[in-house]
């Protein structure tokens, strides 16, 4: 019987598998940041252990840093401690660190791919739940906890049980104005936030193949949001073109040999999947979440669902609780709902393609009066540099947005960028949980174009009706 891409990747990295025990996997790439690594390094010191393979671990600063200042001395509290600790630990062990003073610094899941650290066929781990992003390259990538970070630093291996296999096929082509974010939100809406639990999911179909690498990263980034362990897309010419000449990508004959191997990284025709989900691309409309998990999502031309019409008691109770928190009534048209803030950024949507899409909407327009703040936060120093070369920063600033430095920013309430209590935000991030963007903040997940439209019109609008300047 044939193998799935996941099975091929997993089996290729098994170091040891005793009968009846969890397999031990070799880890090709370990990415670290300032939040989940300090305790791991402390554990190494206490145990008297060294970092086993320094050249396979890379660090960056992203979660708790300020997007306004680049000087560690101007940081405060926990953020300053975490940044200084990461710098100290990387210097002590020889780990390469992309710190705040380099243009290579960025959100870990933006920095890794653009540096060529993310390659097809690899196993990649990071102390961050959205490590699945790297699966867009045909790599087996997943988030790990701090104790596992320590284990990988010490051994370059990790115990990992086999997951089930899931295939999500998006057939045909999407309509104009529909983005990768809309595709993945539609998938989560269909599967629910737990639909992929216990699985590694492979995304396929014409609509997935049509996506750029930036779009594929957006899709895999949110695999975790429907419960999957990891997300995968088989590598192809789009992948190879993106990676060619990246700093850490193979060169010369090594590149040719790598391409030959990478072309084998696909599911066999007779591979068996435990779960199969199919969507028709033509049916996908611009998506907006209405509740407090990414599975509570509708198309912009639909009304907020009525919990009274839900037959499952758990789903009904969850919807009632979500609507109470989010401050909406059943059967509300989201196009009538004003927003207080807009956030364009995060490891989901802060790449150059995302910023171009937002700028196309905001060009020649101004922030709506009712919108208190619009944050545009590039995913890395290189994205920022490219955006400024193209003049995108000037478009954002002219529209009344704030153009910031790279970082995780308002995706999570761990730094200075937060919502005020009960403020409503159109956000390009990946989670709309209660309090995710700040105490009692209300988050609606959308694509960059939809977020930009909310910024200039002051409410949610159907991007398909907006003329681009």
From Swiss-Prot:
Cofactor note, please?
A: Binds 1 [4Fe-4S] cluster per subunit.
Q: What class of enzyme is it?
A: lyase
State the source organism's domain of life: Bacteria
Q: Which GO terms describe its biological process?
A: L-leucine biosynthetic process
> Which protein are we looking at?
3-isopropylmalate dehydratase large subunit
Quaternary structure annotation from Swiss-Prot or TrEMBL? Heterodimer of LeuC and LeuD.
| Entry keyword set | 4Fe-4S, Amino-acid biosynthesis, Branched-chain amino acid biosynthesis, Iron, Iron-sulfur, Leucine biosynthesis, Lyase, Metal-binding
């Amino acid at each position: 019987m044939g193998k799935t891409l996941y099975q091929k990747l997993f089996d290729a990295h098994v170091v040891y598998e005793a009968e009846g025990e969890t397999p031990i996997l070799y880890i090709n790439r370990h990415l670290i940041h300032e939040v989940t690594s300090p305790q791991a390094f402390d554990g190494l010191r206490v145990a008297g252990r060294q970092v086993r393979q320094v050249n396979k671990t890379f660090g960056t600063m992203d979660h708790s840093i300020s997007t306004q200042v680049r000087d560690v001395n101007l940081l405060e509290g926990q953020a300053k401690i975490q940044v200084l600790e990461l710098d100290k630990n990387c210097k002590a062990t020889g780990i390469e660190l992309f710190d705040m003073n380099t243009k290579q610094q960025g959100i870990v899941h933006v920095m890794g791919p653009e540096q060529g650290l993310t390659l097809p066929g690899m196993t990649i781990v990071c102390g961050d739940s959205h490590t699945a992003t790297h699966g867009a390259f045909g790599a087996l990538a997943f988030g790990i906890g701090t104790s596992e970070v320590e284990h990988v630093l010490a051994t370059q291996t990790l115990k990992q049980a086999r997951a089930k296999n899931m295939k999500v096929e998006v057939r045909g082509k999407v309509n104009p104005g529909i983005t990768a974010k809309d595709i993945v939100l539609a998938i989560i809406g269909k599967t629910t936030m737990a639909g992929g639990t216990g699985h590694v999911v492979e995304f396929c179909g014409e609509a997935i193949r049509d996506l750029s690498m930036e779009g594929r990263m957006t899709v895999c980034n949110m695999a975790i949001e429907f419960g999957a362990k990891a997300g995968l897309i088989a590598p192809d010419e789009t992948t190879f073109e993106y990676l060619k000449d990246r700093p850490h990508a193979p060169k010369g004959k090594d590149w040719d040999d790598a391409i030959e191997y990478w072309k084998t990284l696909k599911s066999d025709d007779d591979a068996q999947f435990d779960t199969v989900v199919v969507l028709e691309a033509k049916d996908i409309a611009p998506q907006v979440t209405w509740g407090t998990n990414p599975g509570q999502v509708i198309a912009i031309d639909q009304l907020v669902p009525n919990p009274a019409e839900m037959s499952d008691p758990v789903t009904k109770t969850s919807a009632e609780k979500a609507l109470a928190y989010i401050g909406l009534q059943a059967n509300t048209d989201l196009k009538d709902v004003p927003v207080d803030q807009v956030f364009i950024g995060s490891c989901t949507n802060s790449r150059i393609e995302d910023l171009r899409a937002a700028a196309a909407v905001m060009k020649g327009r101004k922030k709506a009066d009712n919108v208190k703040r619009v944050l545009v936060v590039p995913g890395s120093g290189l994205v920022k540099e490219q955006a400024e070369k193209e003049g995108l920063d000037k478009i954002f600033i002219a529209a009344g947005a704030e153009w910031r430095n790279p970082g995780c920013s308002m995706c999570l309430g761990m730094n200075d960028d937060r919502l005020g209590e009960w403020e409503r935000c159109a956000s390009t991030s990946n989670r709309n949980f209660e309090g995710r963007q700040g105490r009692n903040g209300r988050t609606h997940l959308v694509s960059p174009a939809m977020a930009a439209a909310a910024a200039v019109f002051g409410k949610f609008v159907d991007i398909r009706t907006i003329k681009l300047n």
